[in-house]
Amino acid sequence: IDCGTVMIPSECDPKSS
């Protein structure tokens, strides 16, 4: 699954925090 597709992208993308 794509990190941007998940409900919590911030959990997959640390830089998104």
Curated annotation (Swiss-Prot):
Subcellular location as annotated: Secreted
Superkingdom: Eukaryota
Entry comment describing in which tissues the protein is expressed: Expressed by the venom gland.
Keyword Secreted: yes
Motif (D/ECD-tripeptide) on chain: 11-13
Disulfide bridge positions per record: 3-12
Record flagged with keyword Disulfide bond: yes
GO cellular component term of the entry, any: extracellular region
Keywords: Cell adhesion impairing toxin, Disulfide bond, Secreted, Toxin
GO MF: toxin activity
UniProt function note: Venom protein with disintegrin activity. Interacts with both alpha-1/beta-1 (ITGA1/ITGB1) and alpha-v/beta-3 (ITGAV/ITGB3) with a more pronounced effect for alpha-1/beta-1 (ITGA1/ITGB1). Inhibits the cell adhesion of the human glioblastoma cell line U87 and the melanoma cell line IGR39 to fibrinogen and fibronectin. Also inhibits cell adhesion of the rat pheochromocytoma cell line PC12 to type IV collagen.
Note from the entry: Negative results: does not affect the viability of U87, IGR-39 and PC12 cell lines at 100 uM after 24, 48 or 72 hours incubation time. Does not inhibit cell adhesion of the human glioblastoma cell line U87 and the melanoma cell line IGR39 to collagen IV or laminin. In vivo, does not show toxicity on mice by intracerebroventricular injection.
Similarity field: Belongs to the disintegrin-like family.
Protein name: RK peptide
